[in-house]
Amino acid sequence: MAPQSPVDARSAGVPLDELKKLALSRPTPRCGSEALRCGRVTVIAEIDPARADRTSLAEQYASRGVAALAVPAGDPACVADIAAFADVPVLSLEPATASYQIWQARAQGADLVLVPAAALPDVALVALVERAESIAMTAVVEVRDGRDLVRALRAGARVVLLRPPVGATAAQARTALADLLSMCPEGVVRVAECGPAGQADLISFARLGADAVLLGTELLDGADPGATAGRLASMGAHPALSRSR
């Protein structure tokens, strides 16, 4: 007998019909695309679910100008905890490869959900983007190469998360993201994943047309992550990097 998949295990505990009722009882999700594209380069800050102060950190990030919060895959309760304390949109970074996960993300209070283009055939990619939009969520389609960017756009993605190829060096990552940014049409919200350079990456990606940047936990593991996120959010709002020029 084949091992039970994580999604099958979850649906055995909470059937899809029950999950849908729970999801639709939640407040209407906030519009992620509007939050991320507002005339400046916005910042999405990732929160480590293992942190004991994760809800306090969510409040700090929001108060310091972060446009959205991202929660990695792992503890499903973390998304609900963060969503309860944050007044900005929340992105679930658990890669959604099944409709059940879209519904679960909404039931937990997420406003945006990650859909990995590389892990899905075209039909499934289109279906998941449409499912997210149909329940007022924002699908953030993860893209690591030009082929998947084209597929994401054909699937109707309004927001794309541009990430470098797995295993790329810092220099290779910057080159790959620059290439992807140059391929994105104006109508799509372009989110670029910041590398170790942080500030330098934000400036570089902004000049290449990024609407937002994702700050991973490795960039926010210092003594005062709130200050770090706030500084980068302020930098993204600088007139020199304005997206409305």
Residue ranges with predicted function:
Residues 40-45, 81-93, 131-140, 183-193:
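Short beta-strand/loop segments at the ligand-binding rim of alpha/beta enzyme cores
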